[in-house]
Swiss-Prot record:
One of its GO terms (biological process) is translation. Residues 7-16 have a biased composition (Basic residues). GO terms for cellular component: large ribosomal subunit. InterPro entries: Ribosomal_bL32 (IPR002677), Ribosomal_bL32_bact (IPR044957), Ribosomal_zn-bd (IPR011332). This is Large ribosomal subunit protein bL32. GO terms for molecular function: structural constituent of ribosome. It comes from the Bacteria. Belongs to the bacterial ribosomal protein bL32 family. The keyword S-adenosyl-L-methionine does not apply. Keywords: Ribonucleoprotein, Ribosomal protein. SUPFAM superfamilies: Zn-binding ribosomal proteins. Residues 1-37 are annotated as: Disordered.
Amino acid sequence: MAVQQNKKSRSKRGMRRSHDALSTAQLSVDATSGELHRRHNVTADGFYRGQKVINK
């Protein structure tokens, strides 16, 4: 097992974790139906970038 040679300070730990924060989901308005959806994802009614891609 790896064991650290010296204890890492709170500052170094914080600097390492500075990139771990989660960002909020980016939402867009669909041009066809006007509903909100996540970026780069198909809407609930099956549209993606103005085209019908899923038939239910």
